[in-house]
Structure formats: C-alpha cells, structure tokens
C-alpha cells in the first residue's frame, strides 16, 4: 500500500475521532434538569471507563460527585474527563472542589434535586466525598 494512501486513511480516522468530541463546555442551563449524564474517564492502563452519574448546576457551574469509586480516582488523577449528554460529547477539565463551604452547597443542591434517592444513595457511599466542578 502506498504511504500516501495509508496517511490518508489515518487522516480520515483522526478527523472522525476529533469531530465526535467538542472542546467547549455545553450550555449548563440546559443540563440543570437532566437526571443523569455519562462520564468517560481514563483508566491507569489507558482504557476508558463509562459511568452514569448525577449532575447539578449551581450559578452556571456544573458539578458531579463521588466517593470511593474507580472512576472518581481516574478523574482526580487525570484532572479531565469526557462528558456525554444528549447534545454531544465534551472534553472537559474536572477540578476537585476543596472549599468545605462550596462542597456543602453542592451536596445540598444534590439533596434538593434528587431528594430521597440522594438520601438512600448516601447510605452506600464509602470513602472520601469528592465533588468535581466541570470546566472547559
């Protein structure tokens, strides 16, 4: 096979891969009522892990949370993830929220949004509570 043809195929594959992931953050206001989103994190071996999680939007900022999970370890280690929502897939940074006051605000927002489901899920959370802010 001529090298130009193999280069052409590689270019097409690369273009397809890059076109499927947007690099700007979604309109968070459109996700405020979403019950779940999909987080794609990168495993230590380079593989991908797909996890369905809850999301809250506060003051035009989106947050996800976890405790004692592999996907949370991946996100904390890498500082980034891909977020899959009905509008598409987005490559984002995930900043761990360190402010206790901000964590409590986010936890309260989860409790308000998800109600007794959040209370019940809380019974099965183990390990450090981690809240991540999603940013471009």
Short names for language-model regions:
Residues 1-11:
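Bacterial N-terminal signal peptides that target proteins for export
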Residues 9-19:
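Bacterial N-terminal signal peptides
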Residues 22-26:
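Boundary at the C-terminal end of the N-terminal hydrophobic targeting segment
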Residues 28-32:
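N-terminal helix-cap/turn-to-beta initiation motif at the start of protein domains
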């Amino acid at each position: 096979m001529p090298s130009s043809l193999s280069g052409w195929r590689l270019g097409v594959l690369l273009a397809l891969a890059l076109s499927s992931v947007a690099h700007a953050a979604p309109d968070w206001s459109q996700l405020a009522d979403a019950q779940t989103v999909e987080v794609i994190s990168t495993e230590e071996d380079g593989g991908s892990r797909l996890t369905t999680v809850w999301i809250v939007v506060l003051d035009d900022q989106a947050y996800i949370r976890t405790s004692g999970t592999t996907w949370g370890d991946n996100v904390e280690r890498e500082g980034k993830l891909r977020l899959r929502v009905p509008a598409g897939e987005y490559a984002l940074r995930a900043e761990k929220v360190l402010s206790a006051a901000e964590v409590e605000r986010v936890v309260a927002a989860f409790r308000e949004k998800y109600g007794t489901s959040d209370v019940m899920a809380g019974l099965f959370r183990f390990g450090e509570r981690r809240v991540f802010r999603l940013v471009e």
